[in-house]
Regions:
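Surface-exposed loop/interface segments of Gram-negative outer-membrane beta-barrel transport/assembly proteins
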Residues: 2-79, 97-99, 103-225
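Long hydrophobic segments that form regular secondary structure
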Residues: 91-92
Length: 225
């Protein structure tokens, strides 16, 4: 007998761009920079604010609609599973069985922070000395404390990409022999082998100074790194 089972699922989604959580292990405070989740924004923003107007956040221009168009994450996920079971009886009392299973999972996450997003503009917010000193996204030269903080992202935006892949297969072969002697003696023999393998891969890429409006040409300075 032969039995085949298979299934696959694919998901493509676009989510608002955001960074990972920062946890203060001393005070227990949890915060997330550049959080533009629409539900969170609507829940924590005053209703008297005009959603089409431009305000200031992180010392840079901010508009929620502009952010959703210029700071987002594209997610692609694939999950496929297949199973094969084969049973064969070459002679009376002997059954051979082969079971194989294969699973493959892949996910890709691309975070686009375009030139005009609040996050990219925050790295360039230094209109006066007060903002320069207060903006934590500017670079302060540790070797020259008297120099004003400078931007590490004079042009362009940011790009983050992460790939996660996993392949898993399992093969099991068994043999079962059963025989009755003189209608009162029963002999059962069973043997088998199993082979399992799991392989995981993770790749990450971070690009700085990518000019989305100029053919994705990078322009960056070494202080960013």
């Amino acid at each position: 007998s032969l039995n085949l089972i298979g299934g696959a699922a694919y998901r493509k989604q676009r989510a608002p761009g955001t960074l990972g959580q920062d946890v203060d292990v001393v005070g227990g405070e949890v915060k997330r920079d550049f959080d533009i989740n629409p539900y969170s924004y609507a829940s924590n923003t005053s209703r008297v604010l005009d959603p089409s107007a431009t305000y200031v956040a992180n010392y840079a221009p901010f508009n929620i609609f502009n952010e959703l168009n210029n700071n987002y994450i594209d997610l692609n996920t694939l999950d496929a599973r297949f199973q094969l079971e084969l049973k064969y009886k070459p002679v009376k009392g002997l059954e051979l069985s082969l079971l194989g299973a294969f699973k493959y999972m892949a996910s890709t996450q691309e975070h686009f922070v375009k030139d005009e997003s609040n996050q990219a503009l925050a790295y360039r917010a230094m209109s006066n000395g007060i903002i320069r000193d207060a903006n934590k996204y500017l670079y302060k030269d540790p070797n020259n404390p008297y120099v004003l903080p400078m931007t590490v992202l004079p042009y362009g935006g940011l790009y983050h990409k992460g790939d996660n892949r996993m392949s898993d297969y399992d093969i099991r072969a068994t043999a079962n022999y059963s025989h009755t002697f003189a209608d009162k003696h029963i002999m059962n023999l069973f043997g088998g082998m199993e082979l399992t393998s799991i392989e995981r891969q993770r790749n990450a890429f971070e690009g700085a100074g990518l000019r989305y409006d100029a053919g994705m040409v990078p322009f960056y300075i070494y202080q960013y790194f």
